């Protein structure tokens, strides 16, 4: 921040405060409605699964592209009068809804797959019309209200357990739970963060300011996400990312600013001058730290997947807002408050021990005398933590993907009683004949039958619903005869063919329903196998275009796309970070060491994620029902991108203080001990806040949010303890004066004890921006 900008902000401090208050008030209504414009699956990528979904929606007269499954469990069989009356009442109620295109129940189709073996559980399908399918998730409350209305009219309905499930219902509940997780995480983390801030500042007023900045940053960012959703599809998980990152960096940056302001007051400056000085020094450090986080989020934009791009956009917005608040609103408020931020005085005296450097000096001194021993101990711990990473398996988690206890999840469990849970998310195989041909022509019908028979040989497949699986025991020759007269076929199987055969008879659909014992992880293997079979050439389907889609296939496409671009993302972040550090410190070893340490903290976080979630060691502490068996692909990509930026803040802080002491004394060992002891309490406070904010989301009901929250919390913990307090200073001791080569030659250093010729302003030291970070703290 320039001196002119600093003076301008302080001069017009009341206007700055009024402007931000106005923006925050205007942001509240949109922030409150942000969940309404977010989606669980944002789509939009030109993948095979997206092509299959588009064909299903566009080619069939009454597509079962989006449907609700209503489950009924009762104390009596479906043939009893009360059960039959309830089923008829529910289906009639939904048929009256304009958004419902068709309803199929056991009473309509007499399909045994719709009823459990004991005949006490059934389900029926309510399919949305083409127009309603465009906003399928938003219609879940309408369907549930129709069900509740029908239940209220029948006294005997109270003896039955009824749930609304299906993909739109699951997506709606995911969005609802995600919003609840965000609110719950904020409610838990803010009070705990307040305790850490009081401990760090020894003052109630000073502790309150960072919390205010964090809350305003989240509110304004939610409003910006609401506006951005009109131009770019936004994932529902943006809620959790904005909340986590907003609170974390907002409070962290404010901690830096308030700490510097109090230091300037203690040096005798007035409130306005102290605020101006804080902006010019700590403000520059905040901007630099913010840029390192932005680099990580910006790198995610190279991945053309709407889910990751929307998360990246949300992260960019909240970091930018947090930085702006920290360098404008916060110093303006500090200039107004002045000495009032230090109250009450007795609290500062009570907590003075926390800030005394002697508390950390014994550790710094021991590490200075035994750097090799510290490096060896730290290396063994790091190896033990990162070892599980070798067993990392990327995929859709087998358990806990959907939040437990919701209406849709309970309905999915009811489907297991029938053996039909796979109906909710079938693998959808769309086959389209060449232009001018009929997919149900005799040549293609035999190929369809071969493909269906091949798919059903896999024990993970429960059944296939298609135009060649209408009735058991029917041969391909009989199907060829049936479809030789399409009008006759539609007259006989009209309802089914309207969903599985296009009007021009060119396109058909196969729904592959998996067994209830098939996990999502194994289902991804089934998708890849079906694609291999179809692309390998099925006799009779040589000229047919095959597209495999559905929820699981979308997960396969997302994973392949992200993993294919992950090396580029890693390279971009690592190279950019290394260049920034090389320019800041004029050193070769420092950026290499910093990048290696950052990679180690990320690897350690991944190792613990694998241990706790994939293998289930201690997973019950986070509410897991069992091992997930795989880690969702978005988690390692996002954790790497975010942690690399966040951890750099602590690295720059520690290295800058060491460099400042080295420039003053010319003694590397003394500089390392001094830098470590001087920064330990601040790093501890800042990291504790981050760990609290991220850690509270480790107990969310959404598994993907748990994974991200746990990964970020663990990474910050490892970075602030094992990395910054043990390994980094140990390596600094061992490298000696070579740390600063070529900016400072090992033989060209100041004499021990030599001071500077003048009081340096931020940016004047060899460390440049990094030096300003040190002075800021």
List the predicted regions and their residue ranges.
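Loop-to-helix "switch" segment enriched in basic
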Residues: 37-38, 400
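Structured non-transmembrane domains adjacent to transmembrane bundles in polytopic membrane proteins
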Residues: 46-67, 74-165, 396-619, 630, ...
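Membrane-embedded transmembrane helical bundles of large multi-pass transporters/channels
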Residues: 1-36, 100, 129-396, 539-777
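Membrane-proximal amphipathic alpha-helices
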Residues: 41-45
């Amino acid at each position: 921040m320039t001196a002119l900008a600093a003076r301008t902000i302080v001069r017009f401090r009341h206007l700055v405060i009024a402007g931000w208050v106005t923006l925050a008030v205007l942001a509240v209504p949109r922030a409150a409605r942000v969940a309404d414009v977010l989606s669980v699956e944002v789509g939009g990528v030109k993948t095979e699964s997206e092509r299959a979904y588009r064909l299903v929606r566009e080619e069939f007269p009454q597509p079962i592209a989006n449907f609700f499954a209503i489950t009924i469990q009762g104390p009596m069989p479906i043939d009893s009068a009360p059960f039959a009356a309830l089923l008829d009442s529910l289906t009639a109620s939904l048929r009256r809804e304009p958004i419902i295109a068709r309803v199929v129940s056991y009473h309509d189709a007499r399909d045994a797959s719709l009823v459990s073996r004991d005949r006490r559980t059934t389900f029926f399908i309510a399919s949305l019309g083409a127009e309603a399918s465009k906003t399928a998730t938003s219609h879940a409350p309408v369907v549930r209200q129709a069900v509740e209305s029908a239940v209220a009219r029948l006294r005997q309905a109270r003896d039955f357990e009824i749930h609304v499930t299906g993909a739109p219902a699951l997506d709606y509940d995911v969005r609802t739970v995600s919003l609840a997780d965000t609110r719950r995480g904020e409610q838990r983390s803010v009070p705990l963060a307040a305790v850490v801030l009081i401990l760090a500042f020894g003052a109630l007023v000073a502790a309150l300011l960072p919390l205010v900045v964090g809350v305003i940053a989240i509110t304004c960012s939610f409003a910006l996400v609401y506006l951005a959703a009109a131009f770019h599809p936004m994932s529902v998980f943006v809620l959790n990312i904005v909340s986590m990152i907003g609170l974390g960096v907002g409070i962290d940056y404010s901690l830096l600013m308030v700490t510097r302001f109090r230091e300037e007051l203690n040096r005798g400056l007035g409130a306005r001058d102290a605020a101006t000085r804080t902006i010019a020094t700590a403000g520059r450090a905040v901007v630099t730290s913010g840029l390192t986080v932005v680099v990580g989020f910006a790198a995610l934009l190279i991945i053309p997947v709407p889910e990751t791009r929307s998360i990246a956009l949300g992260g960019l917005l909240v970091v930018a807002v947090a930085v702006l608040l920290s360098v404008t609103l916060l110093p303006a408020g500090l200039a107004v408050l002045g000495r009032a931020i230090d109250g009450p005085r007795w609290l500062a005296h009570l907590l003075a021990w926390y800030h005394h450097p002697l508390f950390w000096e014994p550790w710094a001194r021991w590490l200075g005398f035994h750097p090799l021993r510290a490096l060896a101990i730290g290396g063994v711990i790091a190896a033990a933590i990162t070892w599980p990473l070798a067993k990392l398996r990327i995929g859709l988690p087998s358990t806990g993907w959907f939040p437990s206890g919701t209406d849709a999840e309970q309905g999915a469990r009811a489907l297991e009683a029938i053996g039909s849970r796979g109906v909710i998310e079938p693998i959808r195989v769309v086959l389209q004949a060449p232009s001018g041909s009929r997919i149900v022509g005799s040549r293609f019908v035999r190929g369809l039958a071969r493909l269906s028979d091949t798919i059903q040989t896999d024990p993970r497949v429960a059944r296939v619903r298609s135009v060649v699986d209408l009735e058991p025991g029917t041969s391909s020759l009989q199907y060829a005869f049936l479809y030789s007269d399409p009008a006759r076929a539609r007259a006989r199987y009209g309802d089914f063919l309207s969903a599985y055969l296009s009007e021009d008879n060119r396109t058909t659909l196969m729904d592959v329903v998996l067994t209830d014992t098939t996990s999502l992880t194994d289902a991804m293997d089934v998708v890849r196998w079906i694609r291999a079979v179809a692309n390998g050439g099925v006799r009779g389907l040589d000229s047919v275009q095959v597209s495999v889609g559905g929820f699981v296939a979308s997960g396969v496409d997302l994973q392949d796309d992200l993993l294919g671009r992950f090396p580029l993302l890693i390279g971009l972040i690592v190279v950019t970070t290394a260049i920034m550090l090389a320019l800041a410190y004029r050193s070769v070893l420092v950026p290499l060491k910093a990048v290696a340490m950052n990679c180690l903290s990320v690897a350690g976080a991944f190792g613990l994620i694998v241990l706790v979630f994939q293998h289930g060691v201690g997973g019950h502490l986070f509410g897991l029902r069992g091992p997930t068996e795989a880690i969702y692909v978005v988690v390692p990509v996002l954790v790497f991108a975010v942690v690399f930026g966040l951890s750099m803040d602590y690295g720059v802080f520690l290295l800058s203080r060491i460099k400042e002491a080295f420039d003053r004394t010319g003694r590397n060992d003394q500089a390392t001990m001094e830098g470590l002891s001087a920064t330990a309490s601040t790093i501890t406070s800042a990291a504790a806040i981050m760990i609290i904010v991220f850690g509270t989301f480790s107990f969310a009901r959404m598994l993907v949010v748990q994974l991200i929250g746990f990964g970020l919390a663990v990474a910050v913990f490892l970075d602030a303890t094992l990395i910054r307090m043990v390994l980094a200073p140990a390596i600094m001791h061992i490298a000696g004066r070579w740390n600063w080569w070529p900016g400072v030659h090992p033989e060209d250093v100041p004499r021990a004890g030599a001071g500077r010729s003048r009081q340096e302003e931020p940016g004047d030291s060899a460390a440049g921006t990094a030096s300003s970070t040190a002075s800021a703290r």
